[in-house]
Regions:
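Extended, low-polarity transmembrane helix blocks
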Residues: 1-105, 136-207
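Membrane-interface interhelical connector segments
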Residues: 74-75, 107-132
Length: 207
């Protein structure tokens, strides 16, 4: 009940500020798993992806930078390479690649009418969704999104500007979904998952 929600919020805050980061990620994973199991009505792809990202975070050095935990560890600007880093990268790419395969099996995506059909469902549109519904650009959007999904393996195969541009394009697509469709946390979680693919020069500029 209320206690479980409070504990979940506390774990989320700890993760955001980077206090006992790995432990906070693991605790949050367990608590969200419990909450989602108790309420299947809120279950969606976003929650599924969020839980898996949290589980990977429990094995990643997420407290090494931009976290309270960073105060207690020696400064280290080296690369973090492990089975966990490989796992989280593969996890995200698999989501996109499987999505691409499923869409290629359907006629609507190949024809370019899938996105137009989605925006005709009033219960799904939100915000700017009603403004873009029915516009011819949605057909272009169908082909463009399918092309991005097909190219998703380049997230791990490509480097430098190519990878950065692909991350930006996929993130832009998700933000467009967030502004126009009622998809829960899926678009935002997807954007967060893409951040792990940004190359070091991007993060150096951020700092």
């Amino acid at each position: 009940g209320t206690f479980l929600f409070g504990l979940t919020a506390l774990a989320a805050v700890a993760l955001v500020v980077g206090y006992r980061s790995r432990l906070a990620a693991l605790v949050l994973f367990v608590l969200l798993l419990s909450l989602h199991a108790r309420n299947l009505l809120i279950a969606n792809a976003g929650n599924w992806l969020l839980r898996r990202l949290l589980l990977w975070c429990a094995f990643l050095p997420i407290g090494r930078r931009w976290a309270l935990d960073a105060r207690h560890v020696a400064a280290d600007r080296g690369r973090a390479v492990s089975i966990a880093t490989l796992g989280v990268l593969v996890q995200v790419v698999v989501v996109y690649a499987v999505n691409a395969v499923l869409k290629l099996r359907g006629d609507r995506w190949v024809e370019g009418s899938a996105v137009q059909y989605i925006y005709q469902v009033d219960s799904l549109t939100v915000g700017l969704g009603d403004l873009v519904a029915g516009t011819p650009l949605l057909s272009v959007g169908s082909h463009a999104w399918l092309a991005l999904l097909v190219c998703s393996p380049l997230l791990v195969l490509a480097r430098g500007h190519v990878r950065t541009l692909l991350v930006a394009a996929l993130a832009g697509g998700h933000l467009f979904m967030f502004a126009t469709l009622r998809l829960g946390v899926f678009p935002l979680v997807s954007v967060a998952s893409l951040l792990v693919f940004l190359p070091p020069p991007v993060w150096d500029r951020v700092e």
